[in-house]
Amino acid sequence: PVVAIFRGTVDTFLDALIILGAGILVLVYLFADLGGLSLDVKSVDALLYKNWFWWGLDLVADGLVLIYVAGSWYLLATIITGQKLFMENVARAALMLELLVSWMVWSHHLLADQGQPEMMKLISGEMVTAFELLTQGLALFITLVTLWKARPLKMTNELKYLLGGLIGFGLAVPAGIIQADMAMNRVLHNTQWIIGAHVHIAIIVGLYMTLYSAVYVLWPHVTNNAKLWSQKLANTHFWLHLIGGIGMGAFMGMAGLDGMLRRHMYFNGEFDLMMILAGVCGAMVLLAWIIFLFNIIMSIGLKGLIGIFLPSKNKESSYGI
């Protein structure tokens, strides 16, 4: 976890610099145009700008999300099992390898860009990107083996949601590798596959369920061992979120395979069935969140909820805040 924090912090700093610089350039041209000053757009190389922008923005997904999530898996697995992480040295090495990988994979966003050099598409966009299947696959494997070696384990909320997070990334990462193939990208580029099968499942299932696991690990520490109001609601939340999140991404991905573009309006009902099914699954995720929120509020009570935002009467409990 400490290595993951260090790794993620490096990419956070770099990402902030790159995106800030890219954004300032846009604002310069925007305000100049509003002020009646016409700047020469050709003075900025469009291809260089796109590479600069995607190098920075890609650090968010390929550097920050994957690394912070992997670090969270390791921490959660050791807390849940009470045992040392399996292959701890390899886990550290994989996190550091991802540092280099995340800096060199941005071209997978430019595989359909005609101006992007073909060699950069092949090496950065396809070959180096494939290493993320190795680095994240190692993180998933190490976490699962750590849990396996500690069996029998009680299927607690934190364990269930951790497994749900592993399932999410176990589906989303290969979906991303598939679309990072130069041939498959011809079919999948800018379609609902990208935002559905890859992004939605990674974030809604992989990231969110990992965070829910962390919530249940922290629950007794931040509530003075308050009892969860309803375990049945916690179970309902789990299944609705898992099935709804995977279903939403899957149906969007199926529409993408049939050619449905993202950021595009369709008026003739070509993809209505898949979008309706994706919408139903999305509603399941929303309902799951409402159930989770209701269960949390009922567990701490309205007085406890309001008390979160009030100063503590115990001076020691708020020391340093």
Describe each model-derived feature in a short phrase.
Residues 152-153, 159:
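Cytosolic-side membrane-entry/anchor segment at the start of a transmembrane helix
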Residues 1-2, 11-40, 54-81, 88-111, ...:
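Hydrophobic cores of alpha-helical transmembrane segments in multi-pass integral membrane proteins
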Residues 113-118, 185-189, 262-265:
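Membrane-interface helix termini and inter-helical loops of multi-pass transporters
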Residues 226:
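Catalytic-face loop-and-helix region of soluble metabolic enzyme cores
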Residues 118-119, 140:
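Glycine/proline-enriched, intrinsically flexible loops and inter-domain linkers
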Residues 43-55, 188-193:
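Juxtamembrane membrane-water interface segments that cap and precede transmembrane helices
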